[in-house]
Amino acid sequence: MVSKSLFLAAAVNLAGVLAQAPTAVLNGNEVISGVLEGKVDTFKGIPFADPPLNDLRFKHPQPFTGSYQGLKANDFSPACMQLDPGNSLTLLDKALGLAKVIPEEFRGPLYDMAKGTVSMNEDCLYLNVFRPAGTKPDAKLPVMVWIYGGAFVYGSSAAYPGNSYVKESINMGQPVVFVSINYRTGPFGFLGGDAITAEGNTNAGLHDQRKGLEWVSDNIANFGGDPDKVMIFGESAGAMSVAHQLIAYGGDNTYNGKKLFHSAILQSGGPLPYHDSSSVGPDISYNRFAQYAGCDTSASANDTLECLRSKSSSVLHDAQNSYDLKDLFGLLPQFLGFGPRPDGNIIPDAAYELFRSGRYAKVPYISGNQEDEGTAFAPVALNATTTPHVKKWLQYIFYDASEASIDRVLSLYPQTLSVGSPFRTGILNALTPQFKRVAAILSDMLFQSPRRVMLSATKDVNRWTYLSTHLHNLVPFLGTFHGNELIFQFNVNIGPANSYLRYFISFANHHDPNVGTNLLQWDQYTDEGKEMLEIHMTDNVMRTDDYRIEGISNFETDVNLYG
């Protein structure tokens, strides 16, 4: 009886030990604790910079000067101030009848991801670490650093818990540490115009990301990660951020003499040939934002900026939402108004020029797209039902382009339902007479063209490319739409989830997506073969990246079509 009691006591004690909160030691002796979630140790809401408040609003992030001692890293931090994504989804609902066309198993997770950004605060520069349970500081596991998307106007690391990646990495026998970083978006992170340029605080959101990467370099070993094996990856604006981290400081991705990252994955995003931070577009965005915030734009640049810094967070949040929602959906005008722009500092030249001249970090990468990227954005032009309507809309979007340039776009993307997006659906899915045409233009302008620019310019690194078609003929009007792959990576472990998780985990471990995946061999992209992986719902095939060459090439060369 005594021995049985001792056994039970030992078992209870062991269970208590196993259930203890995971810990990590920072700065030599400052202990933080996290939460054990099944097979994953989680540390959420770790500050990596001082709060960008008061005089630090709109400025580059400053190193964290507080203490970590006793931090209970149990919960995600609030999102940074931003456009309300729930409004965007609601407008899509009204415009497309989203509830009718997106299957419930997809629609629910989309709204769940949006909920991750409901709580907002300017004090938002925090990151999260996910690792296999029980990982020791000397484990030296590869690190996957996630940069979220959201058109540079919304998004939050809380919407993308890393549990799915860590669990699958354990299953594969290729364990990783997953890190996600908050960064400022919209005017809080990408305010442009003469005033902010003169002050030297452009592209604050990019600097937030880089400050997070510096924190990883300094601290991730304390969580069992290897700072010499860091992969950055993201989707949409997150992928565009990855592209701009590749060209930051002309390709110098070093910090304290060591590389900040060693590989990259760009999902549905790449470099965009934005005009510089003091050009017409950013100035328009700056002045509209200031006006909506109640600041006098006729005053001096310094006075206007001081006024903006004096306003409450709620006033600026309302101002941003007023600007974003002034059009039907408002995403594209805002998308072209805010975002990373050349500033002579972190982005020293135009993005395409930096890649084409070899001024980028020489690391292996993967870049790919969904087949129908533009369908989620096409509602901005739902009222354009004739060619003259579309031309007028293009003149608004491409405000710096000549009439000849716009006419060429219209000729390359005719009002022929069978060649519009969703692609390969014949005359079906024509929500309006011009919907498929506009969707095709946006697919190629914003996503396909930047991907091909990168591939053609980066001949001296190993690179892989893919096209996802797994929702073909499954979702009316939207097809394999922008952002759907996130559902499979973070929410629903069905269909192509294995392809995304396993290829990407292998790439983080080996700089090769093919090791230990039990998936189709994914061949490297070459200029001669243009090898491309096509991701299906349950299987994959290799194909050639040779679709819509003339239309996509036009966007590669006519950069005045971008703002």
UniProtKB/Swiss-Prot annotation:
Keywords in alphabetical order, please. Disulfide bond, Glycoprotein, Hydrolase, Lipid degradation, Lipid metabolism, Pyrrolidone carboxylic acid, Secreted, Signal
Q: Which reaction does it catalyse?
A: a triacylglycerol + H2O = a diacylglycerol + a fatty acid + H(+)
Main enzyme class: hydrolase
What's its EC? 3.1.1.3
Signal sequence, start to end: 1-19
Modification Pyrrolidone carboxylic acid occurs at: 20
Q: Name one GO molecular function term.
A: triacylglycerol lipase activity
Q: Name one GO cellular component term.
A: extracellular region
Residues modified by carbohydrate are 302, 383
The yes or no answer to whether the keyword Nucleotide-binding is present is no
A Gene Ontology BP annotation from the UniProt entry? lipid catabolic process
Q: Enumerate the active-site residues.
A: 236 (acyl-ester intermediate), 373 (charge relay system), 482 (charge relay system)
Q: How does it assemble?
A: Homotrimer.
Q: Which family does it belong to?
A: Belongs to the type-B carboxylesterase/lipase family.
What is the official name of this protein in its record?
Lipase 1
Annotated source species: Geotrichum fermentans (Yeast)
Recorded name of the encoding gene: LIP1
